[in-house]
Regions:
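Short beta-strand segments that buttress and anchor functional surface loops
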Residues: 48-55, 74-80
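Helix-adjacent hinge/juxtasegments
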Residues: 60-67, 73-81
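Hydrophobic pocket/interface hotspot
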Residues: 16-20, 26, 50, 64, ...
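Hydrophobic ligand-binding cavity/cleft-lining segments
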Residues: 1-42, 149-150
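Short, surface-exposed coil-to-beta transition loops
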Residues: 2-4, 58-62, 85-90
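A short, structured loop/turn motif at beta-sheet edges
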Residues: 10-14, 65-70, 92-102, 146
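Beta-strand/loop substructures that line and gate deep hydrophobic ligand-binding cavities in soluble
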Residues: 79-134, 139, 150
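Generic structural detector for well-ordered beta-strands
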Residues: 6-10, 37, 51, 63, ...
Length: 150
């Protein structure tokens, strides 16, 4: 199953991409997470793992499979909630004007067990859709405020 949410953010894409991948700042804006870090002081790049804990207490370790600043960062789950057989996500940053960016969060997942997939995937999809909208709205508010001259 796939869900995707996008917003137009009044900040240039280079800053948005950098801020979105800055784990030291992540919990300031990310309303979905209570913990997020790259182990051993690593910096985001292809092959690097990331640890995240959601507000519900679920944890996921994902691995960067694409990292192309300032355009896209993508990960796939290597360990996570047992209800997910597979999970991957991408955050895309498309310049609309020099100071305006379309930010799109897209997630793909497959639920398990297979015999319950017909029930689980729509429920998980609805959950992720609500939280992804909140998460991206929170990022937009934070980034636009952060970009204001001081």
């Amino acid at each position: 199953m796939r869900i995707s949410v996008s917003r137009i953010v009044g900040v240039d894409r280079r800053r948005l991409f950098t801020w979105s991948q800055d784990y030291a700042r992540r919990l300031v804006w990310d309303s979905f997470l209570t913990d997020a870090y790259l182990p051993d002081g690593m910096t985001a790049d292809v092959g690097v793992d990331a640890f995240c804990r959601s507000q519900s207490g679920a944890t996921m370790v994902s691995r960067y499979i694409s990292y192309r600043p300032p355009q896209v960062a993508a990960v796939e789950m290597i360990d996570g909630p047992k209800v997910l057989e597979r999970f991957s996500g991408s955050w895309n940053f498309t310049e609309r004007t020099p100071d305006t960016t379309e930010v799109k969060f897209t997630y793909h997942f497959r639920a398990q067990p297979a015999w319950l997939r017909w029930l689980l995937e729509p429920l998980i999809g609805a959950f992720y859709l609500v939280h992804t909208r909140r998460r991206l709205d929170s990022f937009k508010r934070w980034a636009e405020a952060e970009a204001l001259p001081r």
